[in-house]
Every structure is written in structure tokens, then in C-alpha cells.
Curated annotation (Swiss-Prot):
BP term (GO), one: purine ribonucleoside salvage
Residues marked Important for substrate specificity (site): S184, V239
Protein name (Swiss-Prot/TrEMBL): S-methyl-5'-thioadenosine phosphorylase
Knockout mutant characteristics: No visible auditory phenotype.
Record has Nucleus as a keyword: yes
Biological role stated in the UniProt entry: Catalyzes the reversible phosphorylation of S-methyl-5'-thioadenosine (MTA) to adenine and 5-methylthioribose-1-phosphate. Involved in the breakdown of MTA, a major by-product of polyamine biosynthesis. Responsible for the first step in the methionine salvage pathway after MTA has been generated from S-adenosylmethionine. Has broad substrate specificity with 6-aminopurine nucleosides as preferred substrates.
Lineage of producing organism: Eukaryota, Metazoa, Ecdysozoa, Arthropoda, Hexapoda
Subunit field text: Homotrimer.
Native source organism of the sequence: Drosophila melanogaster
Compartmental location: Cytoplasm; Nucleus
Residues annotated to bind phosphate: S24, R66, H67, T99, A100, T203
Enzyme Commission number(s) of this protein: 2.4.2.28
InterPro entries: MTAP (IPR010044), Nucleoside_phosphorylase_d (IPR000845), Nucleoside_phosphorylase_sf (IPR035994), Purine_phosphorylase-2_CS (IPR018099)
Residue positions binding substrate: M202, D226, Y227, D228
Length: 289
């Protein structure tokens, strides 16, 4: 049985350790100094790959390839629970991640970077909680509030990093996460726009939900790679265009993440870390009402 610590009377600043979850081109271990691989077992199975621990400018970081370093795990088959639990288990306090997205808005052009603030979950097959009633899991049922969906302070750090580096980035967006691996139909794409979606991808959910349930401060940098298929007169999204646009812009995301690591390390996050854990505890029912 896993126990979750809800109370902490320690008044000293809590140390930070930053998990970085990346897709193709953003799982390069060379961004870490003094790196070493660590295989972690979790109550929820194996993560997508071994964790790579190291430092970025003296700050402890952990790198995980969301789809495996061979990129052979499709979005539906990513073990999101094992990934998040493994990063939590090695002491991460923050998660900063990258994701490739289609744009549902004319003003978010292919190649643009976006720091999203909310999501719409259209997945159908993915486990969304650690509190599943099994013996090895935390006790109770967690009804986690998902507003705000992302850590606002972590989002602001990412935006500050982009500004300092003079890399344009849209400061908010709602991501629609679909099950995949197929792309949307045109009718679906139009529907998501009508719902208020700005971006569409296949990985934010349940990753962002599980990160919050694990008490981690989660922020994301999205690369808009295409216009999905809602624009009339356009052929729509295809894998080759996605990969090309992602590769052309991945260095900008790396620069933002590295800059953000330094910014996070300079600040005291004790209150945010404790509040994130307390949010989980306050919304977990462990007995009969």
C-alpha cells in the first residue's frame, strides 16, 4: 500500500528536482551533465524507457522519452501512470514537457510555440488515476479538481524563458487531446474549434492529470506543426509535415526548457509544492461518507 504524506511542518525551502518529458528530438541526453541511466520499477508497470538523471547548469534533472528512445510506443500505449510515478519516485517536484500539436487557429501558425493553459480530453482508453482501488495503489478515491489544469507559476516560468530568449510564444491555449493514432476527420476538427480548442494532440491527457494527482508542478511547451484539417483548400495533416516542422523548431524548445530549469532553481517553491500535495489530500475520499 502506498501512503501519501499530506502534512509537512518543515519551514526550510524545499529542494527542487525537474523532470523533463520529451518526444522526438527532445529526449537527447546530451542536454544533461553527469548523466546516468536509472531503471525504475513502479506499481503501475514499466515507464516508457530508463530515466536519465543528471544536471543542467548544476540543477538536478531527470529526462524521460515519452514514446521510448526508439519512438516505438504509440500515444495510446504510453504507460502514463508508470512514467509519472517513476519521476515522482525519484524526487521530481516539477515536470516541464514538450508536445507536438496541430493548430486549430489561424493565428497559431505551423512552427509557432505555445504554452497551453487548459485541455479538453477526448481520449477513450487511458487510465486517469493512481487511485484505482488496487492493493499497491494509494488508498481512497481522488476527485481531483482540474482548474487550473497546469501549474500557473510553472507556465509563467516557461513564458519568461521564451521572452528572455526572444523566442515568440503564445501565452495560452486549450489543447484537445484525441486518442489517436489516427488524425481527426474534418468534421471533428471543426467541432473542436467550435468547442474552444486551440491545439490538438495525442499526449497531454492523461499526463497532465496524473502529474497533478502526483503533486507535481506541470508545464508544457507545444510546437504547432500543422493546421490539422479544418482549413478549406488544404490537404490536411500528415506525418512527414509534422516531423519536418518539429525538427525545424525543436532547438527553440530546448533553449526554453534549459532556461526554465535555471529560473525554477532560483526560486523558493516550498509553498507551491506543499499546496500541490495538499490539493490531492483534500480531494481524496478514503472512507464511507
Amino acid at each position: 500500500m502506498i501512503t501519501i504524506k499530506c502534512k509537512d511542518t518543515n519551514l526550510d525551502p524545499l529542494p527542487v528536482k525537474i523532470g523533463i518529458i520529451g518526444g522526438s528530438g527532445l529526449d537527447d541526453p546530451d542536454i544533461l551533465e553527469q548523466r546516468q541511466e536509472r531503471v525504475v520499477e513502479t506499481p503501475y508497470g514499466e515507464p516508457s524507457d530508463a530515466l536519465i538523471e543528471g544536471e543542467i547548469n548544476g540543477v538536478q534533472c531527470v529526462l524521460l522519452a515519452r514514446h521510448g528512445r526508439k519512438h516505438d510506443i504509440m500515444p495510446s500505449n504510453v504507460n502514463y501512470r508508470a512514467n509519472i510515478w517513476a519521476l515522482r519516485d525519484v524526487g521530481c517536484t516539477h515536470l516541464i514537457v514538450s508536445t507536438a500539436c496541430g493548430s486549430l487557429r489561424e493565428e497559431i501558425k505551423p512552427g509557432n510555440l505555445v504554452v497551453p493553459h487548459d485541455f479538453i480530453d477526448r481520449t477513450t482508453k487511458r487510465l486517469q488515476t493512481f487511485y484505482d482501488g488496487k492493493a499497491q495503489s494509494p488508498r481512497g478515491v481522488c476527485h481531483l479538481p482540474m482548474f487550473p489544469a497546469f501549474s500557473e507559476r510553472t507556465r509563467n516560468i516557461l513564458l519568461q524563458a521564451a521572452k528572455e530568449l526572444e523566442i515568440p510564444a503564445h501565452d495560452k491555449a486549450t489543447i484537445v487531446t484525441i486518442e489517436g493514432p489516427r488524425f481527426s476527420s474534418r468534421s471533428e476538427s471543426h467541432m473542436f474549434r467550435q468547442w474552444g480548442g486551440d491545439l490538438i494532440n495525442m499526449t497531454t491527457c492523461p499526463e497532465v492529470v496524473l502529474a497533478k494527482e502526483a503533486g507535481l508542478l506541470y508545464g508544457s511547451v507545444a510546437i504547432a506543426t500543422d493546421y490539422d484539417c479544418w482549413r478549406m483548400g488544404c490537404e490536411g495533416v500528415n506525418v512527414q509535415d509534422v516531423l519536418r516542422t518539429f525538427a525545424e523548431n525543436v532547438i527553440k524548445v530546448k533553449k526554453i526548457l534549459v532556461n526554465a530549469v535555471g529560473r525554477i532553481a532560483k526560486e523558493d517553491w516550498s509553498e507551491d509544492i506543499l499546496n500541490a500535495k495538499q490539493c490531492v489530500c483534500n480531494n481524496t475520499m478514503s472512507g464511507a461518507m
